[in-house]
Amino acid sequence: MKQDLLDGEWVYKEENYRRAFELLDRYVDAFADGLSSGRSIRAEEIDVKRVLLLGIGGSGIVCDVVAEILSSRGIATHVSKEYTAPPGEWDLIIAISYSGNTSETLNSLLQFLDQEDKIVAVTSNGRLARLGEKLGIKVVKVGSGIPPRYAFPDMLGGILGYLEKLGLDFAKMNLEEIKEFQEGLKKDKRIDENPAKEAAVKISKSHPIIYVYREVKLPGYRLKCELNENAKVFCHYAEIPEALHNDIEAIPRNGLIIIPRSFREPYEISKTIEALSRLLGEEKSLELRARSKSYLEEIIELFMLSDYISLYTSVLRGVNPLILHRIERLKDINAAYHDIKRRLDEELG
């Protein structure tokens, strides 16, 4: 039985699962380490009104979260996940690449090397770190040697710690409360008291369809990406109420509607979700909730929940949550990637 598999001990002794859960279990400590790293960078307070964020994939989701946080304070932001970024006058340019070798991010950054005093990079190493050393760009270093998607808390903590130094203090959080929430998601918690295990069992038997609204758009997208990468599950992702005017007509028979919920959820959205549940049946829907009633803490808890769900789903499917065969192979055969890295190596001398 699937419950026996997730509640057993032997499966977590397999090296790929042991390592993946080990990385995830360090979530709060990794965030705290990132904060310390960001706070250690020498910087003066500045008036920040316009921010450009460069990043893609596991690093790009960090850009998304930071952009949402900054926007909530009235700061104009743009997240670029392309090969080139929009020109313009920016007070701050944030480049995030865990490996330091992300071609899209590096190519975009080449446009702004004459504004090195406005740039801050978050990375573990690679060409981005070398570029910082050569040009005097500020670099927030995070620990190396792990898959980028598992370094989300390190990178988020790193850039939030740096933003504190600029006078933008967003990191007042109750980390002990987040740790307490995480304890309920770990592998030693049985399925009947572990929402991540319970969700994974349902997802493993269905076609997952993730519906989000503005307040939970990012946690929902995180779940989609982690199911893709860790569990090798293809899933649908759409925003409501828009999705309720088209794709609900095509929900497959084995479809499972997954909706992250927020304490900031608008009344109209709440009633819409209630109606959708009545229409499809409660057995066809799965709600994901955090415990915190603080904006940033809720985001982190929902991300954490999504990550654990994806790992438990990978266990049930018997796939390796650490290896990405197609993504890495595509990088190897993509001539654009090699051209960008060649140009950057010329810049580095």
Q: What is each PLM-predicted segment?
A:
Residues 79-82, 233-244, 284-293:
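A generic structural motif
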Residues 58, 215-216, 242, 262-265, ...:
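Short, glycine-/Ser/Thr-/acidic-enriched flexible segments
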Residues 40, 44-187, 201, 260-286:
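Glycine-rich phosphate-binding loops that contact phosphosugars or nucleotide phosphates
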Residues 2-37, 46, 130-140, 151-156, ...:
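Phosphate-moiety recognition in structured ligand-binding domains
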Residues 18-23, 33-50, 164-255, 333-349:
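Active-site phosphate/pyrophosphate-binding segments
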Residues 69, 111, 226, 308, ...:
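Rossmann-fold NAD(P)-dependent oxidoreductase module
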Residues 86, 145-150, 243-245, 291-297:
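A short acidic, often aromatic-flanked loop/helix-cap motif at beta-alpha or helix-coil junctions
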Residues 51, 88-92, 246-249, 295-301:
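Short, solvent-exposed polar/charged micro-motifs at secondary-structure junctions
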